[in-house]
Each structure stands twice: as C-alpha cells, then as structure tokens.
Regions:
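Conserved phosphate-donor/acceptor-positioning beta-strand/loop module used by diverse small-molecule
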Residues: 183-208
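PAPS-dependent sulfotransferases, especially Golgi type II membrane carbohydrate sulfotransferases
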Residues: 1, 13, 132-150, 160-163, ...
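Flexible, glycine/threonine-enriched loop-and-boundary segments that flank and lead into catalytic domains
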Residues: 161, 165-189
Length: 345
C-alpha cells in the first residue's frame, strides 16, 4: 500500500531521474567495503542506503521515521536514537571484525531485495546456493529478472528523492558481479568500480567467513562442503564475468582498483577513481582521504586461511584465472604482493 501511495503523496518522485549511478562490484573480501566507506563520505555527491532503510522499500515509511527522528532530537534529546543505536550495537558488534554493520551505517543495497529472494544474505541462510541462485541473476528467466530489476530501479529512485535528486546513487555489492548485464540494461549510463585482490587471499577468506556463519546455524560438514564447491565456482565467475560483459559495452566507464594500492595509498587510489569518472575531489572528501592516509598500516589481518582445508590448491586457481594473474602480477605470498602495487587504467 505504501509503495502505491508514494507517487501520489510525493509527485516529484515521477520526475526523479537516476543519472550515472556508480556500482562498486568485485569478489567478496577484495576491498569493496573499504572503498565504499571512503566514497560515501562524499555526501555532497553520493546517495546510498543506510542499513535501516533497506527494511523499507517504500518512501513513505522512511519519511515518517526520519520525521520522528527530528522530533526525537528536538523534544527528547535523542533518547530513542540512543536506544536504537544501543540495540544495533548489541546485535552487530560480534561480527564487525569481518564486516562492519550498524543500523545507521551504509550497507549493501541488495538488502532491499531480501524479500524477493535476490539478496546475497540468502547465502548465509541457505548453504545450497542452487536453491536461490542469487548470484547468477543475468541467467534468471526473463520475466522474473525484469520484474526484479524494475523493482530495484524504483527503490533507487525513491532513495534519490529522499536524499536529493541531484545526487549520484552509490551502490556496493559483491553479488552484483553476476548481474552486470542487467545493471547495464536498466542503468545504461552506469559506471562501474572493480576492485581486484589476489584470489589466493579472497577465496579462502570468503569460504572461512561462510563457514563461520553456517556453523552458527548448525549446518553439517557435508552440506558445507557442497556449499564451498558452489562458492568456489561462483568466485571464479565473479572474477571473469564482469570483464566479459564490459568488453561488450565499450562505452561504459569503468575504474579498476588494485587492492594493494587501496590499502597502502588510499588517497591516490580514490583520486584515480575520481579522475576516471571526471569527478572533482571536494575539500570535505580530501580531508577524509588525508585521515585515511594516517591509518595506513595500522590494521593488519590476524587471519590465515588454507586453500587445502577447502579442497582447493593454488595451481587450480592460477589455471582458472591465468589472465588475471598475468595482468596483476599476483604472488603466492600476501607479503610478496604487498611489496608490489602496480597501477593501471
């Protein structure tokens, strides 16, 4: 009902255009979140979804909740906001080491598709990825795919109306590596950011993350192993499919980011991205990037992952992704990788 009321209560919604949206896509654990965290701070330019907003596809509830937030700040000194934030911290604090989450923090906007069974979060609930097949959306039956993409486009339109129609939608979703063709079809002036990280690091890291989630849900080892095999094939697809699609669409602007550069030179990396898209770096964002430079090297991962524990080997990954290994010069050791940070267009 609220969805149908939106264009009636907010006539300007029909005139809101989605212009040159930016999609940050890439294999999970490849720096998509870190990059998105930097970009969304350019709030004069970008619009994105906060986590709590993903529960409300319609514009009307968001308007009401934001209005209540202003009343809370004015009349109750932010009492209800503090309580909501405390509940959010209690719920998500245990998993923030793997992925930062909070109700008032930007989140992967495929969450708006959860009730349509098209969000990557379903892989946490259903280890047999063939049941929901959220990754391979470009291969869905045409009618179902088009219905979902129309819905997603209208969700973005509502969010832009809410945050400012003049802004650019910013999306970060690793699962979108399997729906690049659909994104170009429904957003023909879209721009893509592709972070790349050594798959010898990202693949076992992703599998370890999923093992943690599935263990909490009581999934048995045999079912997990089947899920790992499906995730491995999905991982290979995540590295190869976007480039295959973009090669057919030479007019689409793409910025490719090397993870090693992102973590060692965040300012130069974001400046390169902005140059690729013809953006100017605002003073407020420049200050954010300067702060990011001061934190370089302060966070070192404590995790070590083994390919063998998932029935994989370095040789088979190198064979499947040989062109990318040649292009990026990825080493066998993460320490060796960190010593070389090539830049490219």
């Amino acid at each position: 009902v609220c969805w149908l009321l939106d264009p009636i209560l907010f006539p300007g919604l029909r005139r809101t255009e989605i212009v040159e949206p930016v999609f940050v896509i890439g294999h999970g654990r490849s720096g998509t979140t870190h990059l998105h965290d930097l970009l969304y701070r350019d709030q004069e330019r970008f619009s994105c979804f906060m986590m709590w907003e993903l529960f409300w596809p319609s514009l009307l509830p968001k308007k009401l909740i934001r209005g209540f937030g202003r009343l809370d700040a004015r009349w109750f000194g932010g009492l209800f906001e503090r309580r909501a934030r405390a509940r959010s911290d209690a719920r998500y604090s245990k998993t923030r080491d793997a992925h930062h989450q909070a109700a008032d923090y930007p989140e992967e906007d495929d969450g708006i598709l959860t009730y349509s069974c098209a969000s990557g979060s379903w892989s946490l609930r259903v280890p047999d990825l063939s049941i929901v097949s959220v990754h391979y959306l470009d291969e869905w039956p045409e009618r179902r795919r088009r219905r979902l993409m129309r819905f997603y486009r209208e969700c973005i339109r509502r969010q832009l109306y809410l945050n400012g129609p003049e802004k650019t939608h910013l999306s970060k979703n690793p699962t979108f590596t399997g729906r690049v063709e659909s994104l170009i079809e429904y957003f023909p002036d879209a721009r893509f950011v592709l972070p790349y990280r050594n798959p010898l690091e990202t693949i076992p890291s992703l599998l370890a993350l999923m093992r943690g989630f599935w263990t909490l849900r009581g999934v048995d080892e045999e079912t997990m192993q089947r899920g790992f095999a499906q995730l491995y094939e999905q991982s290979i697809h995540s590295y190869t499919y976007p480039e295959d699609v973009l090669a057919r669409h030479q007019d689409i602007l793409v910025s490719r980011i090397d993870y090693r550069s992102l973590v060692t030179r965040p300012r130069a990396t974001v400046e390169k991205l902005y140059a690729d898209f013809g953006y100017e770096v605002a003073p407020s964002l420049r200050a954010v990037l300067e702060e990011a430079e001061t934190r370089v090297g302060h966070h070192e991962t404590k995790h070590q992952y083994s390919l063998e524990s998932y029935g994989l080997s370095e040789t088979q990954i190198r064979e499947r992704l040989a062109p990318l290994f040649a292009r990026f010069g990825w080493a066998s050791s993460p320490d060796e990788d960190s010593a070389t940070t090539p830049s490219f267009g």
